[in-house]
Each structure stands twice: as structure tokens, then as C-alpha cells.
């Protein structure tokens, strides 16, 4: 990014907190649509003069001046047409605007990583990087707060929060227009369905806004944690997750009131850990149930005072790790007690010693997984495989490749499960659904196709791990059985893909 700053003239705009002129630079749209930076884009005609200063200015003018109150015999048709054109203009401009507002935060993130000398930060982007952390920490904790982060946030509150970072009034007005245009209401984030709708229109902009909201929310928690802990973290770091998690800040305004120190006294607990993925977070601690209840009601007041959100207390659950399972990121996680009896011999006397060991257990929730397959039309609600009729127009090799890729991705993601037997039901559903799809395409029976394809058909549904292990070790060896049953966490899984994306 640094070597392109002199072409973008970023230093000059950033110094004066003025980003609005960047909207009229055509290379911004080249970056937005090509999703990459190279010297030829910035110096040459990146997008064939599609986004010149005059064109962008004209689009912004039309975007602001569209009139939806046209009275004519064809009013409904004209309104729908102009509404479509207005959305088109705003979407085109907002793509470039998303790149602009990301620039200062991206540079802050890069500088923070350099200051803390975090070189291999790409490993922290992986979803699976959370689970080794849970395995290491949760064995020593007692209680966990299962938090559904409240999502209704008023547009004006978000804009006012952004004013601390973007002091350009024109950019803020344009952002306010996008928010009201896309949502046409009082809440920016109302449900997962709304987020998906926003993402389809302008994924980059609204993911940035959602990440910024989460960043502001978490910065206060990090500040409280560092100020209240006896064992302050000296290398907190910045966790980089490109899609869902933009960054964690550890600096806040130093204006402290007298009552604030009372709050810090309530949360003096060195063994408190926080994890978040999308709109769900976990706050685990070794403390007592009383202190966890204080955390719960403090968080409720925190949402009300800082974001004008009135969350319901039932959105924050207090669970004991020893007798409750935690539904997080597609796994049912719990701390299980394994008891074992050891015989000890001392001279002529023998003793039976009972030993209890805590073990972090991760289970695949098979019912929700089958429900996801049913929603994607691979099976019915009972888990019986059906044909994927929308794929019958594809070539046989493409159909087999799609089913095999989905199966491998599922096994890849759930490779860290302590009980993998339930995954073979998923493999059975996908394999038979693939056979039914091919049989439906060729107007044949499933039995005939399975007999025709033979063992080659099965190879598409082997996971990469099974292929490698089958080449290195015999399947019946004890070492191989241990590896098949063992957990494997990966540091290259950035997000969970929807089954329907391949359509």
C-alpha cells in the first residue's frame, strides 16, 4: 500500500481529513472492481475512462435528484425504472466510496502490525485459529457468557461514531445517503437476512460498516479488560480477519470519572477471555457466578448508553462449562470430565487411584447440518437424499466435482471434531444425492449409475486428509486409526461458505 500512496495522493487527503475528492478519481473504481492494486491501474486508463470526473459527478447528481413522485399514466412503470436507475447509480458510487473509507483503517492496521512486529498475521485470519485457543484456555475456566450481540443500531449513531475518524462532512453526507437509500428505515442491521441483502448490493461497504460497529463495541471491552486485570496483556495484538473482523483497538479517550474506578473494581479478574465470530461472542472466566451476573448487567447498560440499544437479558446466557454445551461456529463445545482408575503398588500394598482429567470436547451438530443440506435441496427435512434438479443441465464431471467439493469442504471444516462418525451420514447424503442427480439427468435408475461409475465415483468424496493418510499408512494400523480419529485444525479457512453458493 505504501508504494502506491504517492499516486493516490493519500497523505495529502488524510492530513486534512478530506476524502471526498477521491470519489472522482477513476483508479478508485479500478481498485473496487478489480480488487487489487498495481502500478498500471494507477498510471494508465484502468477502466477505459468509464469513471471520469464528469461521469461520476453526473451520477452523483442523478442519484440525489431522482424524483419518485412522477404523476403520469405510466407512473408505476416510470417509478420502478427510476428507482432501479437510482439504485444502480448509488451502487456504482458506493463501490468506490467503500474503497475510500477503508484506506485510513487499513493503514492504521498495517502500522499497528508493524509496531507490534506481527509478521505472520495471516494465520490469525483463520476461523479454526479460535479452537486451539479454546482448547488451551477453557479447561481452566468455570463460566461462560454466551452473548448475542444486539444488532439494531440507529443510522445517525453510526454516522456520529464515524465522525471521530472521518471528519469530511461531504463524505459523511454521502454515507448517510447510502444508509437511508439501502435501508429506508431507522435500523442499519436488523437481522441476518438484512445483512445478506446488503451484502448482495454492496458487500464491501456494509461489511466495513458492520466491522466498524464491532470494532467500536469491542474496543471498550478490551480497554476495560486491560485496565482491570492484574495480569495486563503486553502483546494484545491486532487480529486481522478480512471479511468479518477488521480490527481491535486498545486506545480510548482517557477521560475517566470517579464511578469508572468502581466498575473496574468489579471486573478485576485475570482469567477472562473473549472470542467473537460475526454477531455472537463468548466471554469466559474463572470467576464466580456472581461476577458473571455483574458482567451481564454491565453489558446491557453498556449497549444502552453507547449505542442506544435496549437488548433483552435473555440474549445473554450464563452457562457453566462443566454441564452445558456451547453452540459456537457450527460446533457444540463443552468441557468433559474423563475419569480413569490407576492401580498403584507400594511394597505389599496396592492402591486404586481415581483420576479426573478435563477434556475440551467438540461435537458436530448433525441436525442443523442436515437442515442446511435440506435448505440447499440436497435432501428432505428427514435427511433422505434427493436429486439436485437445478444442476441437471451441467456436465457429469461438473456435477460430480461440485458434490465432491462440498463434501470435502464439510469434512475439512469439521476435521477438528472429537466425534467424526456423524459426518459419514453427511457423506452418504451427498453421495446418494449426486447419484440421484445424475440418474435424473440421464433418465436412469440410481442402481444403474452406481454400478456404472463404480469405485471412481467414490474417489470424489474422499477428503484430502484421507487420501494422504491412505498413501502413507495402511488403514488398519494403530497410528493411522489415531490420525483418523484425531483433531486437525487448519489455519487457511477464512469463512464458512453457503451450500447454495455454487448454484
UniProtKB/Swiss-Prot annotation:
Principal subcellular localization: plastid
InterPro entries documented for this protein: Domain_X, Maturase_MatK, Maturase_MatK_N
Coiled-coil boundaries: none
Keywords: Chloroplast, mRNA processing, Plastid, RNA-binding, tRNA processing
Location of this chain's protein in the cell: Plastid, Chloroplast
GO annotations of cellular component type: chloroplast
MF GO annotations: RNA binding
One of the GO BP terms on file: tRNA processing
Family: Belongs to the intron maturase 2 family. MatK subfamily.
Role this protein plays: Usually encoded in the trnK tRNA gene intron. Probably assists in splicing its own and other chloroplast group II introns.
Protein known as: Maturase K
Lineage, broadest ranks: Eukaryota, Viridiplantae, Streptophyta, Embryophyta, Tracheophyta
Amino acid at each position: 500500500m505504501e508504494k502506491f500512496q504517492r499516486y493516490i495522493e493519500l497523505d495529502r487527503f488524510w492530513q486534512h481529513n478530506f476524502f471526498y475528492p477521491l470519489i472522482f478519481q477513476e483508479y478508485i473504481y479500478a481498485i473496487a472492481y478489480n480488487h487489487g492494486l498495481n502500478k498500471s491501474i494507477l498510471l494508465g486508463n484502468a477502466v477505459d475512462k468509464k469513471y471520469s470526473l464528469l461521469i461520476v459527478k453526473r451520477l452523483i447528481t442523478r442519484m440525489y435528484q431522482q424524483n419518485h413522485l412522477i404523476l403520469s399514466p405510466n407512473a408505476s412503470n416510470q417509478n420502478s425504472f427510476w428507482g432501479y436507475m437510482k439504485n444502480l447509480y448509488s451502487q456504482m458510487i458506493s463501490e468506490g466510496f467503500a474503497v475510500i473509507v477503508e484506506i485510513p483503517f487499513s493503514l492504521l492496521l498495517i502500522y499497528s502490525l508493524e509496531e507490534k512486529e506481527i509478521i505472520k498475521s495471516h494465520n490469525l485470519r483463520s476461523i479454526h485459529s479460535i479452537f486451539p485457543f479454546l482448547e488451551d484456555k477453557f479447561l481452566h475456566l468455570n463460566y461462560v457468557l454466551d452473548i448475542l450481540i444486539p444488532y439494531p443500531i440507529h443510522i445517525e449513531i453510526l454516522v456520529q461514531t464515524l465522525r471521530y475518524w472521518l471528519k469530511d462532512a461531504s463524505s459523511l453526507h454521502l454515507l448517510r445517503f447510502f444508509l437511508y437509500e439501502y435501508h429506508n428505515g431507522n435500523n442499519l442491521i436488523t437481522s441476518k437476512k438484512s445483512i445478506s441483502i446488503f451484502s448482495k448490493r454492496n458487500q464491501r461497504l456494509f461489511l466495513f460498516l458492520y466491522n466498524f460497529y464491532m470494532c467500536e463495541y469491542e474496543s471498550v471491552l478490551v480497554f476495560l479488560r486491560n485496565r482491570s486485570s492484574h495480569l495486563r496483556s503486553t502483546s494484545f495484538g491486532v487480529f486481522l480477519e478480512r471479511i468479518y473482523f477488521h480490527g481491535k483497538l486498545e486506545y480510548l479517550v482517557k477521560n475517566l470519572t470517579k464511578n469508572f474506578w468502581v466498575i473496574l473494581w468489579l471486573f478485576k479478574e485475570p482469567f477472562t477471555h473473549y472470542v467473537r465470530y460475526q454477531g455472537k461472542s463468548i466471554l469466559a472466566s474463572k470467576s464466580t457466578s456472581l461476577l458473571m451476573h455483574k458482567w451481564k448487567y454491565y453489558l446491557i447498560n453498556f449497549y444502552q448508553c453507547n449505542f442506544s440499544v435496549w437488548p433483552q437479558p435473555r440474549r445473554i446466557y450464563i452457562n457453566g462449562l462443566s454441564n452445558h454445551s456451547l453452540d459456537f461456529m457450527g460446533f457444540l463445545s463443552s468441557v468433559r470430565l474423563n475419569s480413569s482408575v490407576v492401580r498403584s503398588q507400594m511394597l505389599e500394598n496396592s492402591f486404586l487411584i481415581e483420576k479426573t482429567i478435563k477434556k475440551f470436547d467438540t461435537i458436530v451438530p448433525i441436525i442443523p447440518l442436515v437442515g442446511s443440506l435440506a435448505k440447499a435441496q440436497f435432501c428432505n427435512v428427514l435427511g433422505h437424499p434427493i436429486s439436485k434438479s437445478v444442476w441437471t443441465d451441467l456436465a457429469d464431471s461438473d456435477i460430480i466435482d461440485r458434490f465432491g467439493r462440498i463434501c470435502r469442504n464439510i469434512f475439512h471444516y469439521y476435521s477438528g471434531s472429537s466425534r467424526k462418525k456423524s459426518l459419514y451420514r453427511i457423506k452418504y447424503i451427498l453421495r446418494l444425492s449426486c447419484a440421484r442427480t445424475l440418474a435424473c439427468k440421464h433418465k436412469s435408475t440410481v442402481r444403474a449409475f452406481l454400478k456404472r461409475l463404480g469405485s471412481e465415483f467414490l474417489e470424489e468424496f474422499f477428503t484430502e486428509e484421507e487420501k494422504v493418510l491412505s498413501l502413507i499408512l495402511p488403514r488398519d494400523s494403530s497410528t493411522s486409526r489415531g490420525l483418523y480419529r484425531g483433531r486437525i485444525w487448519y489455519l487457511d479457512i477464512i469463512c464458512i461458505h453457503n451450500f447454495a453458493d455454487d448454484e
